[in-house]
Amino acid sequence: MSKVIVVGGGASGMMAALSASKNNNEVILIERNGELGRKLRATGGGRCNFTNNREIEDFFDKVVNNKKFLYSSFYSFTNKDLISYFESKNLEYKIEEENDHKVYTKNDKSIEVIEVLNKDLINHNVKIMYNKKVIDIITEETTEKDDSNKDKLKYLIKGVILDNGDKIFGDKVIISTGGVSYSKTGSDGSMYKILQNHGHTLNRLYPALVPLTIEEKWIKNLQGISMKSVEISCKIKKKKISKTGDMLFAHFGITGPCVLIMSSYINKIIEKEKVELNIDFLPNLNADEISSRIREVPNKNIINNLKQILPQNFLKEILALLSLNDKKASDLSKVDEIKIIEYIKNMKLTCNGTTGINTGMVTSGGISVKEINSSTMESKLIKNLFFTGEVIDIDAETGGYNLQIAFSTGYLSGISV
């Protein structure tokens, strides 16, 4: 039996504490807020898309950074295992197959997930310390034999120091403090500095799943217009990246599920240079089919012919840009028709940044996976120190994948202590 300290009461920290407690360990969960799961509470607009119903092998394609690192985590505690766990706790859920196979609570309430986990922590005698911030970890030097049987200097975790000066000693420590996104929920990134001071490498932090700012000023006129099932693509180092989904025009640029996913693939590039985005608003129709729609009723205004397949206010702005507002289909030249189709099938927008790391849903970057044993989540530098979730340099697309990463890495670290 070991004394295990878990730092951070988010999704991964709660799961780590639960799985650690099942090995008859004494578990202490330290949370800086007055409640557990504050970021989890806001997930999916409060609906809590806690996992995805795709096959677990399909999850790797949705991981943006360091997908191979997650092999042991995903297979130790799969999405089906997570769903079964919540089922066993009588949490009702629903699978929205038409919505990218996302899994939500039946009542669209994230608080239900938190309540299940909280109750289970109590049932497993996990001691929860609220409103306590860890400001350092306690280590001591030790030695272990290397491959050539020579003594090698290593560090051993001994506990943590709280902001009031108290020291809590333990045999194992699990770091589940998250990234820097949504800092108002308590994840301010202070643990990164602590870990750096103890020798760990911090890979640069970037905003992920974040809205994109657009250089073109006229886009403000489209503010508030929502577009369904668009395809956004760009070229990064000669490789085409393409994502499909809904998007929303905003005063600063563009947002929505499709945009957020794309942001995770270009966030590092747009720190250095602008990125040209190509947007196809009707990916299921080719140019000839759109041409037929434009000219469907010759004596009608172009907008009237297209409003069944595109939002009317979107069409008004596009046609205004082309000075074709009130033109009838019969009066439209072939050149102008091609221009309209080009705007619909291949609108070019210049992305010049994001709305910032605090507005991202998750943090890209974090503690280097090279310094963590992926089979156990244990630090390779400090014995008996473990990591979970967003504090590690791993992130994924929207759709429940990031929460599954949190639960899976939390579970694996907990059973490994």
What residue ranges belong to the model's regions?
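N-terminal Rossmann-like FAD-binding beta1-loop-alpha1 element of flavoenzymes
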Residues: 3-29, 413-417
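Short hydrophobic core segments
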Residues: 5-7, 30, 134, 167-181, ...
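Glycine-rich FAD pyrophosphate-binding loop
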Residues: 21-45
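An anion/pyrophosphate-binding glycine-rich loop and adjacent beta-alpha core
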Residues: 34-42, 50, 56-57, 92, ...
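Glycine-rich active-site loop/strand segments that organize a redox cofactor
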Residues: 47-97
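Feature captures the FAD/FMN-dependent oxidoreductase FAD-binding
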Residues: 76-172
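A glycine-rich dinucleotide-binding beta-alpha-beta segment and adjacent secondary-structure elements
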Residues: 129-131, 316-395
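Glycine-rich loop(s) and the adjacent beta-strand/alpha-helix scaffold that form part
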Residues: 172-218
